[in-house]
């Protein structure tokens, strides 16, 4: 998603976490596995200067969400917006009898796995993407998720790491036919996206085990700010949801620094969670990550 900024449009920036249900590094219980994973990710990300990394971990067994100091700070969503639209369309098919053809479902799969922007453009236009953001945010209690200020640019939807974990946790609880569409597409995401961008970073980085499905996102704002996000499920039972949202502001683009920071945070979090994840069971996804060598190509 190539972004050309509108003059005078305010860019979302990190802010101190508001009072809400997400526990921060200072308030999370020290024995919580999610808290330990979040802290490890925060420390790993902090090893690289000048990169803002928001980290949140949700435990679907306890319902706890823990995040670092930036976990409730809004950032541009980039392609994480595709999950929101997919949830809305499938929910409306089930609750409102929204007509949905097999080709429409294939659009959802293409928008999620290969992260095909043309498929998302069709979904956004035909199925009221702007309204989808509000409907899903209200239904799921995503209080820090908002529709884009420019209606035609879905990547300008704003969200947070904490809200991203809640969104994916909801996906895991959807009826199997709907959950399978979303999670199945994410689990089969290729290492190189439809636009040629290498998706093998964060939770999809080579060598990271036990990530069953993840959505990646990337975009560039003006000439000096890049966003790189990775959010997904850890464990065959999908007990944990991890979201790592990264932002790097720089005079000259340095995508490798941002990729390294997001990947280090994701690797650290998964490493801590590995001891608590379930083994594959009947009907559960256990898709290994398969990656091809690649470098950053363009912006998404």
Descriptions of predicted regions:
Residues 80-83, 113, 117, 158-165:
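Short alpha-helical patches at coil-to-helix transitions and adjacent helical residues
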Residues 1-8:
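Hydrophobic membrane-insertion alpha-helices, especially the h-region
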Residues 67-71, 105, 114-119, 148-152, ...:
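Flexible glycine/proline-enriched surface loops and loop-helix/loop-strand junctions
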Residues 63-70, 212:
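Amphipathic coiled-coil signal-relay and dimerization helices
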Residues 12-54, 58-60, 125-300:
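Penicillin-recognizing serine hydrolase domain
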Residues 93-143, 160:
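Conserved catalytic neighborhood of penicillin-recognizing serine enzymes
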Residues 63, 74-98, 111, 242:
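Active-site SXXK
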């Amino acid at each position: 998603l190539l972004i050309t900024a509108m003059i005078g449009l305010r860019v979302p920036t990190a802010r101190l976490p508001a009072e809400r249900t997400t526990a921060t590094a200072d308030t999370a219980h020290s024995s919580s596995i999610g808290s330990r994973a979040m802290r490890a990710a925060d420390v790993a990300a902090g090893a690289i200067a000048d990169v803002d990394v928001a980290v949140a971990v949700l435990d679907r067994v306890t319902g706890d969400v823990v995040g670092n100091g930036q976990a409730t700070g809004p950032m541009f969503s980039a392609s994480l917006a595709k999950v929101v639209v997919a949830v809305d369309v499938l929910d409306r098919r089930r609750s409102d009898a929204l007509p949905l053809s097999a080709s429409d479902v294939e659009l959802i799969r293409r928008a999620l796995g290969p992260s095909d922007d043309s498929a998302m453009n069709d979904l956004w236009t035909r199925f009221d993407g702007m309204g989808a953001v509000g409907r899903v945010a209200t239904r799921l209690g995503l209080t820090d998720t908002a529709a884009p200020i420019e209606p035609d640019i879905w990547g300008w939807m704003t969200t947070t790491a904490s809200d991203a974990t809640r969104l994916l946790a909801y996906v895991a609880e959807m009826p199997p036919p709907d959950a399978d569409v979303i999670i199945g597409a994410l689990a089969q995401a290729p290492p190189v996206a439809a636009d040629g961008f290498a998706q093998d970073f964060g939770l999809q980085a080579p060598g990271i085990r036990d990530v069953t499905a993840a959505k990646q996102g990337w975009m560039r704002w003006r000439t000096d700010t890049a966003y790189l996000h990775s959010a997904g499920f850890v464990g065959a039972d999908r007990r944990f949801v991890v979201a790592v949202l990264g932002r790097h502001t720089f005079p000259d683009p340095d995508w490798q620094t941002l990729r390294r920071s997001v990947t280090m945070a994701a690797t650290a979090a998964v490493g801590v969670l590995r001891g608590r994840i379930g083994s594959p069971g009947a009907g559960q996804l256990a898709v290994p990550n398969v990656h091809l060598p690649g470098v950053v190509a363009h912006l998404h």
